[in-house]
Amino acid sequence: MAEIHDITGLLKPYLSGTNLVWTLLLVGYIIPKLFQYLQRLFSPVSRIPGSWLHKLTSLPLKIAIAKGESHIFTVDLHKKYGPIVTLSPTMISISDAREIKRIVHTEDWAKSEAVYGNFRQDPQRPTLLAFTDKKAYSQRKRLVSSMFGLRYIRSMQPLMRNCISVLMDELDKQCANGATAVDMQHMIQSLAADIIGVTTFGQTFDLVKNGSHPLPDRLKQALKLSGILQFMPWLTKIPFIPNRDPYVSWFTNEIVAKRRAQIASRQGPPREDLLQKMIEAADESPTSPFRVSDIQDESVVLLIAGSETTANAELFTLIHLLRHPSKLATLYEEIDRWYPRNDPRPTDCDYSMSGMVYLQACIDETMRLVPGQATGSPRESRKDETLLGYDIPKGTTVFPTTQEVHLDETLWPNATEFLPERWLDVYAKGEANSLPYYPFSAGSRVCIGKHFAAQEMHLSLVSLLRRFQFEYVSGQDESTVFRIAQQMRGHRYLMTVGRR
């Protein structure tokens, strides 16, 4: 009893009033933090080049992400420290072409749980984008692969062309009295959203006609938030920040319910869109890998990824062409060879896509210079690894940075210049797949919608350039931000548009 009394006496000064608060703070936070920092100082990651601050805390990376500047943050670090750098205590970036190929293609590392684990509406049921388990991903991919097969995508051309026709009519109205400045950023983004609406849900959002629609507007906000939540998951624990946007949930649930009712009552022939395919693939059995609830989440991903990334690629392609009038003139010549002026033939991928090599070169060159996945799709070391001679502990997130390998002067002479011609010899030799070029990632996680995007870009750009003349408007902000995908920082971009 005396010993207990002595211990109580020793602790008494620390168990009263303000002292108790400081004691709890010391034991519960400060000491564990000090141990954490010591672990980080002696971790193998600490030996990788980079700022000592980044090896201790992820705060600088999180600030860059919140500002939409993680791609700039990464570029600056690689310029200063070389081909492998520390981003945070558990995240690194690599720009070496051989190691990137090994990670994303040869060894096909799994996606990072630390990143994609936070990119889920339902933590227990990932979308195709957010699977980190290879086996589960393969199972889901098999279920939906028929929806993205080339034959099925080609069958969507009439739906896409209808949306493009609406845009063409709108541009005709705007330049009826001669060439005029048009916000082509808004127009192209609206077109992409309308195309995703009609091909996914069987209904257009009429964004081109009306200028706005609640769903795409809410999804743009969700896109910004998703980019932040990937690296700051603790924000989801704040009560007033929901995992799902209420309007998006209501809209997608309503659409799915109506379509299921139509199918059950056999009202008319089956619709030819992605929603129909997903509903047909869904199974409500307890062990089902794809339920009706999964349709909503996959639909949201299709809307965000399908409209934003494709629209950005189209917009950046036009911007680069307008900056280089001689390249634009060459493209007009190619378009006129395939589709002579006043030719009534509709733009058709089966007819012209494989033959219009200069257009494809312009698109590929743009996606090389401004890749959608600027910092690369983050992967994870599932065992202890070695990269460029450095030990990489199991569980480390590795960013195989696309933008750095795309701008490597040793791989791409005059790397920062827009030179579509560099691709023509590559195509002729059949070497496109051997290049260090990853606009759609690679390996098993190559973008499942790449053929959909390629078709939409071909139809949209060819149709626009067949009818309209575009000219550059100088003095605009052309800087980019990175939020899930690389995009324009500003919310409008003007081009002078007139009839040819």
UniProtKB/Swiss-Prot annotation:
Phenotype of null mutants: Abolishes the production of acurin A.
GO molecular function term, any single one: oxidoreductase activity, acting on paired donors, with incorporation or reduction of molecular oxygen
Source taxon at top rank: Eukaryota
Sugar-bearing residue positions: 210, 414
Segments traversing the membrane: 13-32
Localization in the cell: Membrane
One GO CC term on file: membrane
Residues noted as binding heme in the record, renumbered to the chain: 447
Cofactor(s) essential for the protein: heme
Protein name in UniProt: Cytochrome P450 monooxygenase acrD
Organism: Aspergillus aculeatus (strain ATCC 16872 / CBS 172.66 / WB 5094)
Name of encoding gene: acrD
